[in-house]
């Protein structure tokens, strides 16, 4: 999602690798308007290009979306296809955005933010079927409570599981099992 003037060269380099080896997904790809909006057009073009590669290879995409839900959804709707699916990485949107993402064939990647006091997604996530959720760490960022502000690590995923267990009124083992099945399915493992 970091795009500069030489983004076409960078894309060509990525394409070389995609054609050389087998991968389980294409990503993180997407649009990030948090720091800088000046390269929006280039980000949109790069996103579309990488979506095309994913559709050709029948691979899921992992979407990076920061301050860009409208722009991402516009592209996903125009590229809609049974071969376009994947995960909204580190999902932090609204309930309506969650439903829209799922309607477009995507799962929601849920990590440490669900444990934050003002993260927001804990207010509605249990209205989203667990079959639409995969777990993530976003390591080294976005550590769950009680480690917020510290370097994230994979072992902290248990705190995300614990929070989801409370929100869904299911055992931690059940949350872990169901979300693992979702990940295995989406990445064809």
Over which residues does each language-model region extend?
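Mid-domain alpha/beta scaffold segments of enzyme catalytic cores
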Residues: 1-189
């Amino acid at each position: 999602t970091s795009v500069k003037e030489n983004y076409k060269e960078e894309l060509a380099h990525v394409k070389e690798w995609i054609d050389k080896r087998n991968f389980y997904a294409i990503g993180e790809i997407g649009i990030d308007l948090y720091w800088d909006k000046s390269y929006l057009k280039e980000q949109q073009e790069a996103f579309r290009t990488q979506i095309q590669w994913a559709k050709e290879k029948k691979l899921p995409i992992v979407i990076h979306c920061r301050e860009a839900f409208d722009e991402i959804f516009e592209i996903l709707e125009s590229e809609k296809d049974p071969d376009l699916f994947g995960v909204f990485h580190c999902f932090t949107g609204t309930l309506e955005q969650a439903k829209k993402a799922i309607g477009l064939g995507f799962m929601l990647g849920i990590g440490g933010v669900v444990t934050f006091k003002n993260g927001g997604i804990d207010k509605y996530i249990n209205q989203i079927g667990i079959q639409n959720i995969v777990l993530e760490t976003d390591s080294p960022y976005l550590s769950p409570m009680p480690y917020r502000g510290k370097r994230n690590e994979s072992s902290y995923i248990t705190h995300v599981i614990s929070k989801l267990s409370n929100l869904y009124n299911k055992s931690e083992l059940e949350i872990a099992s169901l979300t693992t099945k979702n990940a295995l399915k989406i990445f064809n493992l």
